Structures are given as C-alpha cells and as structure tokens.
Design a protein with these regions (language model features):
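Gly/Gly-Pro-rich "capping" loops immediately C-terminal to redox-active cysteine motifs
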Residues: 61-87, 98-144, 149
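Alpha-solenoid HEAT/Armadillo repeat architecture
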Residues: 45, 75, 155-158
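Active-site phosphate-binding and catalytic loops of NTP-dependent enzymes
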Residues: 92-96
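Flexible hinge/switch segments at interdomain interfaces of large molecular machines
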Residues: 17-19, 56, 141-143
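Electrostatic cytochrome c docking/interface patches
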Residues: 16-47, 66, 77-81, 105-108, ...
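The canonical Cys-X-X-Cys-His
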Residues: 40-43, 48-59, 70, 150, ...
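C-terminal capping alpha-helices of c-type cytochrome domains
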Residues: 4-7, 12-14, 87, 108-110, ...
Length: 181
C-alpha cells in the first residue's frame, strides 16, 4: 500500500559533528589503557557529548531508560564488547530492546520498544520517553526491527573518545568512578 511508510527513529546526539574518519574497534583497542575516566564520564552524561545517560542508566536507583540498564550489563562485558556496542550497537541487540514497527488500520506508523503486551493491547516506549498504547484490534502489521535505536558512534566519536567512554563504563564494575553526574 503506497500510503504506509516504514521508518525507524534513531536518536542522534545533537552536539557531535560527523567525523571524516571512521572509528573502528581496531583503532580504539590500543587506546584503552590511556582512556580518561573523567572525559568518558563527561561524554556519557553530557547533552552536548555522547549523551548516553539520556537512554542508559548506570545505577539501579536511577529510573529505567529507553536503552538497556548498563549497571547489570557491564558485569559480564569485556572492553572489546563495550567498544563494539558503542561503534556498532546493532551488532548485538539485548533482548527486549529491538525496535518494533507497528502499522495501525488508520495507516499510522508507530515505532518503539515493546514494554507491555496484553491480550488486547501493545504498549510501546518511544525514544522521547512517551508510552503509546495501541489496541491490538487496530494493528495491521507488526515487525520487530533488526536495528538498534542507538546511533552508531563510529563517525561521531574519535577513537580516543570511545576509549574514554569505555574506560568510564569499565570503571563502574570496580567502583573506581561515580555512577552519577
């Protein structure tokens, strides 16, 4: 049907310019030993930086975000996996965080993460934090997307910045850094 559109909202940090050079796992790994925790923390929490905290929480006392809770994920993650997740978030999407695309019988398209499903409705959490409840009887099409709503940072962060964010995240496991701004 020509009236339906398929799109996916991917959040892009506002303050980061697109880089000419692509950051790769290979370019980041040698820099991890010199990753700066303070710079990584600033990038993680800053709205003008990577802004990871907009979607991810690092402490179970913080309210849940749009993205996976990093306080539990980091317990089993190695630095290479963290770097890969930053540069290519679609490589491995945590269960429950794949975007859903739902087309309703009025031709409207809705995207979000499925946060609740009953016999009669679906509830999608959208990137802006709003929840949309859709009656199942109105759903024409529902597709689980193979894309992450998280932007790829391969052209948004330099290898050194990725190393800094990774150093900050890895430090949370050992308690070396504060989990809060």
């Amino acid at each position: 049907d020509g009236n339906k559109s398929n799109f996916l909202v991917i959040i892009r940090p506002a303050g980061l310019p697109r880089l000419a050079e692509v950051s790769t796992v290979k370019s980041v790994l040698p820099l991890l030993a010199n990753g700066q925790l303070d710079r990584g923390k600033a990038l993680f929490f800053s709205k003008g930086g990577a802004g990871c905290s907009k979607c991810h929480r690092t402490d179970t006392t913080q309210p849940p975000g749009f993205g996976p809770d990093l306080s539990s994920l980091l317990k089993q993650a190695d630095p290479r996996k963290v770097v890969t997740s930053i540069l290519d978030p679609g490589a491995e999407i945590k269960e429950g965080f794949a975007m859903q695309l739902v087309v309703t019988d009025d031709g409207k398209t809705h995207t979000g993460i499925l946060v609740d499903e009953t016999g009669s409705s679906l509830t999608l959490l959208q990137p802006d934090g709003r929840k949309v409840v859709l009656p199942k009887k109105m759903v024409d099409e529902r597709v689980s997307q193979k894309l992450s709503p998280m932007p790829s940072f391969e052209r948004l962060l330099t290898p050194a910045q990725v190393a800094d964010v990774t150093a900050y995240l890895m430090s949370l496991r050992s308690g070396k850094a504060s989990r809060r701004r």
